[in-house]
Design a protein with these regions (language model features):
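Short acidic-hydrophobic, aromatic-tinged amphipathic segments that line or gate anion-handling sites
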Residues: 186-188
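Short helix-capping segments at alpha-helix termini
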Residues: 13-16, 43-49, 107-112, 140
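Substrate-recognition "cap/lid" segment bordering the active-site pocket of phosphatases
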Residues: 95-147, 153-157, 161, 176-180
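Short, acidic loop-to-helix structural element flanking the phosphoryl-transfer center
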Residues: 63-90, 96-97
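Structural loop-to-beta junction motif characteristic of Rossmann-like glycosyltransferase folds
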Residues: 163-165
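Active-site neighborhood of HAD-like aspartate-dependent phosphohydrolases
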Residues: 1-22, 83
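A metal-dependent, Asp-based hydrolase signature
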Residues: 27-62, 80
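Conserved SAM-binding loop
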Residues: 70, 88, 148-149, 168
């Protein structure tokens, strides 16, 4: 919710129309892609410097949000994965150091940089499958060796398009059908 509220607040401050629900539909995209889509829809040209400013402001607003506790059971799941000799990879459309630091604080030793795919590692963000295909390559994995856990429709679509078994977890304001329609194999 913090992510979506931050995007909506900053985009509205810059004169764009965006609700938290719409922002959630863009979760997983790179910041540039999100800004470009909204600005084009509204017939505005946003240059590189303005995009950087908007994203920086969004990051600042996000960093002021209250810290949310990890989803119940997530730490235990990651621990079990590692205990069984497997490993987790993180695929995120974000490049915010503060978000990545929060993940490392909440899930110590679960995500190492070599197993993270961020906005800095790809040219095309979600819903393009590139982030997940990059994770497969970086992890030396085949599609049948993976299970994706995703909370955003664009992430579900990207994983599904990459041919990966996808469990959707509805953590937002959207109806379950949005995640299922995006290609989730299972909804939690």
């Amino acid at each position: 919710p913090n992510h979506a509220r931050s995007w909506a607040k900053v985009m509205q401050a810059h004169g764009f129309s965006m609700t938290p629900e719409e922002a959630y539909m863009h979760e997983g995209r790179t910041g540039d892609d999100t800004i470009n889509i909204i600005s084009k829809r509204e017939g505005r040209d946003v240059g590189t410097e303005e995009r950087k400013k908007i994203y920086q402001e969004k990051t600042e607003v996000f960093n002021l949000c209250p810290v949310i506790s990890p989803m119940e059971g997530s730490a235990e799941l990651l621990h079990k994965v590692m205990e069984d000799g497997l490993f987790a990879m993180l695929v995120t459309g974000s490049g915010q150091p503060s978000l990545l630091e929060r993940l490392n604080n909440d899930f110590p030793d679960s995500f190492i940089r070599e197993r993270m795919i961020t906005s800095f590692d790809v040219k095309m963000g979600k819903p393009n499958p590139e982030p997940y295909l990059t994770a497969l390559e970086k992890g030396g994995l085949k599609p049948f060796e993976t299970i994706v856990i995703e909370n955003a429709p664009l992430g579900v679509e990207a994983a599904h398009t990459a041919g990966l078994f996808t469990i959707a977890v509805n953590t937002g304001p959207l109806p379950d059908s949005v995640l299922l329609d995006a290609g989730a194999n299972i909804l939690y």
